[in-house]
């Protein structure tokens, strides 16, 4: 875990691939507990430390996660995420080059909870939810392409599912059609940047994640 930004009300950390944001049935220690311990030790706080989980990243994804350190910040950030006032930018290394260097993708996504997987359709189907994202090619090597992705909606596995539907699965993402896994079990999707108005001070906050420690990321990033 790396702290990217911190003040009295919020803390933004860079999550490593493989970490879970919040506790689940695996029993593995979540990032939220690691951050609580960091706050407890840094500020010598006795007893329980307040930390609000505002959003999540899939376990194999790396990058920025925003937490609230006060109940006031938690309430306001929850509303801001719900209302699309937190602008998140993702970087994805994908197989193949998209047909268009820049485009908006619109699909209808159906989530299969038993498989923990989503399926994208070009038209509305039963139990589907509309999913929209924008992408832009910002780098490439001989075999891979780096896309900058902005979500217009927030669906289950949306980026992974929609890019795979386009014929450009994320490197290492076996679930969505990548031919091989990454050696460390990650998928090459990074929550790269967040920008929002601070819920208390009203200042504009911009944070960027460090690149994963990987030769391909270093070679392909602009």
Describe each model-derived feature in a short phrase:
Residues 1-222:
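RNA pseudouridine synthases
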